[in-house]
Amino acid sequence: MILEFKSEKKMINFSKSFFYPLPIGKIFVLSGDMGSGKTSFLKGLALNLGISYFTSPTYNIVNVYDFINFKFYHIDLYRVSSLEEFELVGGLEILMDLDSIIAIEWPQIALSIVPKDRLFSLTFKIVGSGRVVELNG
């Protein structure tokens, strides 16, 4: 499925409703250039979960949001240079958590160990002043 958004607000509103019911157990991998909308798209999912303050974990690498029955992991691998480094921040344990929703920005390093049966891929592109998102999964 390919979607086009003319504004960040429209992208957030779409992603807020698209992920209902909540996709517990899914691993979302978000690829695309800097500023192409990956974090903005995830803001909608975060709003659906009731998370009002949502930022990219570029420097912490992993943000964890705890809920009663599950966790939401937001992972940003932009600054991670190897699979070993991903493992050092608990990456393998996170990927094995079936009672969670996991979103990984800049996922290239970890793709070889992401369980394919749980994978949902999103590819973002800047087109003019808007954004195009290709969804697979």
From Swiss-Prot:
Belongs to the TsaE family. InterPro entries: P-loop_NTPase, T6A_TsaE. Transmembrane segments: none annotated. The keyword Ribosomal protein does not apply. Required for the formation of a threonylcarbamoyl group on adenosine at position 37 (t(6)A37) in tRNAs that read codons beginning with adenine. Is involved in the transfer of the threonylcarbamoyl moiety of threonylcarbamoyl-AMP (TC-AMP) to the N6 group of A37, together with TsaD and TsaB. TsaE seems to play an indirect role in the t(6)A biosynthesis pathway, possibly in regulating the core enzymatic function of TsaD. This is tRNA threonylcarbamoyladenosine biosynthesis protein TsaE. It comes from Borreliella burgdorferi (strain ATCC 35210 / DSM 4680 / CIP 102532 / B31) (Borrelia burgdorferi). It holds the Pfam family TsaE. ATP binds at E8, G35, S36, G37, K38, T39, S40. The gene is tsaE.
